[in-house]
C-alpha cells in the first residue's frame, strides 16, 4: 500500500454561496429592506470582531454569472462555530430572500514535508498559512478538485517520493505568481464531495486564468487532476452591501 501524506490542519472553512430572490426582495418596502440589511450587517460586524481578535477570518464577494449572487468564505477554529454562523445567518430576514446555491466544507491544509524533529506548529510562516487572515483582494476564484483514481492514472497508488517530486514541480508554478495570486488550500476528504477546495485571491482577475492554464500543462493537473465547478467574483465591502441590495 502506498504511504499516505501527513497533513497539517488549521481553521475549518465554509464556502456559502447564495442567490438572491430579487422578485421576492422587491415586494418589501424600502424600510423593511433597510432593516433586513442592517440586521445582516450586524451579523457581519460580529465576524469583524472575531477577525480583529484573530480568532477567525472571513471574505464576502459577489459572484459573476448565474451560479450564485454572493459568496461567503468563513474560517473558524471549530466545525461547531461554522454551523452556528450558518444557523444565525439563516435566521435573518435577508436569508428569507436568499436561495442556497452551493456550499463547501473543508479545513485549511498543508502537506507536512518538514524534518521529523521540527514542530511545524512553532513555525510562524506555517501558522500564518494554517490560520490565515483572508486578503481584501478585488477578486476571488473558488473550485473543488480531486486527484484521479483511474487505471494507471491513480494518484494514490504512486510512491510517496514520486508524489513529492511532482508536487514540488507543481508548486513551483504557483510560486511564480507570488504577489499576484494568494492561494488557500483546504482539505475536504470526508467533509464534502471533493478532496480539496482551492481558493484564489487576486487584484487582477486575469491572473486566475493565467495561473490555472499554466498549471494544466503540469503532470499533476494534466494527468491526475479532476475539477469541479468554478466560481469567480468581485469583492463586496461591508459599506457596499446596502448598494448591492438596493432596489
Curated annotation (Swiss-Prot):
Superkingdom of this protein's organism: Bacteria
SUPFAM superfamilies, alphabetized: Dimeric alpha+beta barrel
Catalytic activity: Fe-coproporphyrin III + 2 H2O2 + 2 H(+) = heme b + 2 CO2 + 4 H2O; Fe-coproporphyrin III + H2O2 + H(+) = harderoheme III + CO2 + 2 H2O; harderoheme III + H2O2 + H(+) = heme b + CO2 + 2 H2O
Keyword check for Metal-binding: yes
Pathway the protein takes part in: Porphyrin-containing compound metabolism; protoheme biosynthesis
InterPro entries named among the record's database cross-references: CHDC (IPR031332), ChdC/CLD (IPR010644), Dimeric_a/b-barrel (IPR011008)
Family matches, as PANTHER family: COPROHEME DECARBOXYLASE, HEME-DEPENDENT PEROXIDASE YWFI-RELATED
Task performed by this protein: Involved in coproporphyrin-dependent heme b biosynthesis. Catalyzes the decarboxylation of Fe-coproporphyrin III (coproheme) to heme b (protoheme IX), the last step of the pathway. The reaction occurs in a stepwise manner with a three-propionate intermediate.
Protein name: Coproheme decarboxylase
Gene (name only): chdC
Amino acid at each position: 500500500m502506498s504511504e499516505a501524506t501527513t497533513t497539517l490542519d488549521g481553521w475549518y472553512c465554509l464556502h456559502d454561496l447564495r442567490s438572491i430572490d430579487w422578485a421576492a426582495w422587491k415586494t418589501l418596502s424600502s424600510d423593511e429592506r433597510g432593516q433586513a440589511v442592517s440586521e445582516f450587517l450586524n451579523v457581519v460586524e460580529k465576524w469583524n470582531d472575531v477577525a480583529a481578535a484573530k480568532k477567525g477570518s472571513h471574505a464576502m464577494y459577489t459572484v459573476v454569472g448565474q451560479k450564485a449572487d454572493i459568496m461567503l468564505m468563513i474560517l473558524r477554529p471549530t466545525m461547531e462555530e461554522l454551523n452556528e454562523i450558518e444557523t444565525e445567518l439563516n435566521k435573518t430576514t435577508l436569508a428569507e430572500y436568499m436561495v442556497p446555491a452551493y456550499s463547501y466544507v473543508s479545513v485549511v491544509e498543508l502537506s507536512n514535508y518538514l524534518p521529523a524533529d521540527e514542530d511545524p506548529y512553532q513555525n510562524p510562516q506555517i501558522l500564518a498559512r494554517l490560520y490565515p487572515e483572508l486578503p481584501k483582494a478585488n477578486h476571488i476564484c473558488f473550485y473543488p478538485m480531486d486527484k484521479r483514481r483511474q487505471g494507471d492514472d491513480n494518484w494514490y497508488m504512486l510512491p510517496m517520493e514520486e508524489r513529492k517530486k511532482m508536487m514540488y514541480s507543481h508548486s513551483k508554478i504557483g510560486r511564480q505568481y507570488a504577489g499576484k495570486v494568494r492561494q488557500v488550500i483546504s482539505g475536504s476528504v470526508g467533509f464534502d464531495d471533493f478532496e480539496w477546495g482551492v481558493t484564489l485571491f487576486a487584484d487582477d482577475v486575469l491572473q486566475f486564468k493565467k495561473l490555472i492554464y499554466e498549471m494544466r500543462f503540469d503532470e499533476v493537473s494534466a494527468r491526475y487532476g479532476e475539477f469541479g465547478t468554478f466560481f469567480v467574483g468581485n469583492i463586496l465591502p461591508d459599506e457596499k452591501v446596502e448598494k448591492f441590495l438596493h432596489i
